[in-house]
């Protein structure tokens, strides 16, 4: 029989069952399971087991609620039409599926867990909140920073997803979702507010580590590369002349984008011992708030915009990029540093953007309180504008990462590159879920 769970997931399930049985005084069953699974108290001690006591019940109630929701949805005509919609063409629509409210100050950032239905949000009051976006419930409040939380990202070594946060308190903190979001490490080193953090995908040629690297950007005008397993800063990158607002790694982890108040977009080769500037892109007329690499799925559309006869191969990275600025525009760039298109439509600062996993669309949010969808197959035409979704500036936007399943077994929880091209093809499933955070203190979930 083929195995549904990964070895790690199976181990977690076994521990949860043992903890549940122990909590309900089924000692003979506990002893039998511990013996059968070779999980003696020296390996799985009672203190650790206590953390697993309620996990099985939580999972069970989640399944029951999901079953009820599925039954309710199946009776709704709109849900039937939604399920028929191709994920590759899905775009968010109002009203939001959930309006999540618990923050007391503006939300600065959001981040999706790569596998589970968890989402994190960070606010001006140094608070991080963890939610279940599937059910619209607050799971926990995480405290540790002393000033505003400016960015969040999930990632890390395969099989051990971490949450990284950065703050105006000059630090980066690493939290362990598998251990009640315990703060396992604090990374000091920046000399001013840390604006952005992103885990760097594994697979970069020549990279000494795999899945352990984290990039950060700061108002101290540096980008730093960290090893999350040791907490050491491996590289400090200098080149910008003002506050660096955002960073974005390429899919193979070889390149990094950075942008900020000096109005430039910089492309770095971070696979080298001393990172090199490959390109400096100039054109925005105000601070650049956000940047992103275009996924290979968008190359065919962007190549047409760039006037290329043939799209770059899907195996290549760093071919096209996007930036959003306080000058109210979005610019699309090619690998030569040429601005191939300027998208005009927002009436205020562009705060965040994300490419649709299908590559056909680009989504953006702004201080004009709108979410805009741009069709890259139509020369970047704005084909949808969502108004009235928030009551104040929209500060953040994230798309739930797709679920990637290997041919053999598991869902890939690692933020990183699919396996080498020689390997069997992977099954990539688009999750039609986005989240937005706002100065109105609410986190809103849009889904199919």
From Swiss-Prot:
HAMAP family in alphabetical order: lis1 (MF_03141)
Primary location class: cytoplasm
GO cellular component terms, semicolon-separated: cytoplasm; microtubule; microtubule associated complex; spindle pole; transferase complex
Coiled coil: none
Region (Disordered) location: 74-95
Similarity comment: Belongs to the WD repeat LIS1/nudF family.
An example molecular function term from Gene Ontology annotations: dynein complex binding
Protein name: Nuclear distribution protein PAC1
Keywords, ordered alphabetically: Cell cycle, Cell division, Coiled coil, Cytoplasm, Cytoskeleton, Microtubule, Mitosis, Repeat, Transport, WD repeat
Function: Positively regulates the activity of the minus-end directed microtubule motor protein dynein. May enhance dynein-mediated microtubule sliding by targeting dynein to the microtubule plus end. Required for nuclear migration during vegetative growth as well as development. Required for retrograde early endosome (EE) transport from the hyphal tip. Required for localization of dynein to the mitotic spindle poles. Recruits additional proteins to the dynein complex at SPBs.
A Gene Ontology BP annotation from the UniProt entry: microtubule sliding
Places the protein is found: Cytoplasm, Cytoskeleton; Cytoplasm, Cytoskeleton, Spindle pole
Gene: PAC1
Summary of subunit composition and partner proteins: Self-associates. Interacts with NDL1 and dynein.
Entry's free-text remark on domains: Dimerization mediated by the LisH domain may be required to activate dynein.
Domain LisH: residue ranges: 9-41
Pfam families: LisH_PAC1, WD40
Extent of the WD repeats: 102-143, 145-185, 189-236, 239-278, 283-343, 345-384, 389-444
Upper lineage: Eukaryota, Fungi, Dikarya, Ascomycota, Pezizomycotina
This protein's record includes keyword Cell division: yes
Superkingdom to which the source organism belongs: Eukaryota
Annotated Gene3D superfamilies: 1.20.960.30, YVTN repeat-like/Quinoprotein amine dehydrogenase
């Amino acid at each position: 029989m083929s195995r549904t769970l990964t070895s790690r997931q199976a181990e977690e399930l076994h521990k949860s069952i043992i903890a549940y049985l122990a909590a309900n005084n089924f000692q003979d069953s506990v002893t039998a399971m511990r013996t059968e699974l070779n999980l003696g108290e020296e390996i799985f001690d009672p203190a650790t087991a206590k953390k697993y006591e309620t996990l099985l019940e939580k999972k069970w109630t989640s399944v029951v609620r999901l079953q009820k929701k599925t039954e309710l949805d199946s009776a709704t005509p709109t849900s039937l039409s939604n399920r028929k919609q191709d994920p590759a063409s899905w775009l968010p629509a109002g009203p939001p599926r959930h309006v999540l409210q618990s923050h007391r100050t503006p939300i600065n950032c959001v981040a999706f867990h790569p596998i589970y239905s968890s989402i994190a949000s960070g606010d001006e009051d140094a608070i991080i909140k963890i939610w279940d976006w599937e059910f619209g419930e607050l799971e926990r409040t995480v405290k540790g920073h002393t000033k505003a939380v400016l960015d969040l990202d999930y990632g890390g070594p395969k099989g051990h997803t971490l949450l990284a946060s950065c703050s105006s308190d000059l630090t980066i903190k690493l939290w362990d979702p598998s251990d009640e979001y315990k703060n396992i490490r604090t990374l000091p080193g920046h000399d001013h507010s840390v604006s952005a953090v992103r885990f760097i995908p594994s697979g970069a040629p020549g990279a000494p580590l795999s899945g352990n690297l984290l990039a950060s950007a700061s108002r101290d005008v540096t980008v730093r590369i960290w090893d999350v397993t040791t907490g050491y800063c491996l590289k400090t990158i200098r080149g910008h002349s003002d506050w660096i607002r955002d960073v974005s790694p390429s899919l193979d982890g070889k390149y990094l984008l950075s942008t900020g108040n000096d109005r430039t977009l910089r492309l770095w080769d971070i696979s080298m011992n001393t990172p090199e500037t490959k390109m400096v892109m100039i054109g925005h007329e105000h601070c650049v708030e956000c940047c992103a690499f275009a996924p290979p799925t968008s190359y065919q559309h962007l190549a047409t915009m760039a006037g290329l006869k043939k799209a770059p191969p899907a195996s290549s990275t760093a071919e096209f990029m996007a930036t959003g600025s306080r000058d109210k525009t979005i610019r699309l760039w090619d690998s030569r540093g040429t601005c191939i298109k300027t998208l005009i439509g927002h009436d205020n600062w562009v705060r965040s953007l994300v490419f649709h996993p299908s590559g056909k669309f680009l989504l953006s949010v702004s201080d004009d309180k709108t979410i805009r969808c741009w069709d890259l197959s139509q020369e970047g035409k704005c084909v949808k504008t969502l108004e009235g979704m928030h009551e104040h500036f929209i500060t953040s936007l994230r798309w739930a990462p797709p679920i990637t399943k290997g041919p053999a077994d598991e869902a890939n929880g690692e933020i990183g590159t699919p396996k080498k091209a020689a390997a069997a093809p992977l099954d990539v499933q688009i999750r039609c879920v986005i989240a937005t955070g706002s100065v109105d203190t609410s986190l809103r979930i849009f889904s199919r």
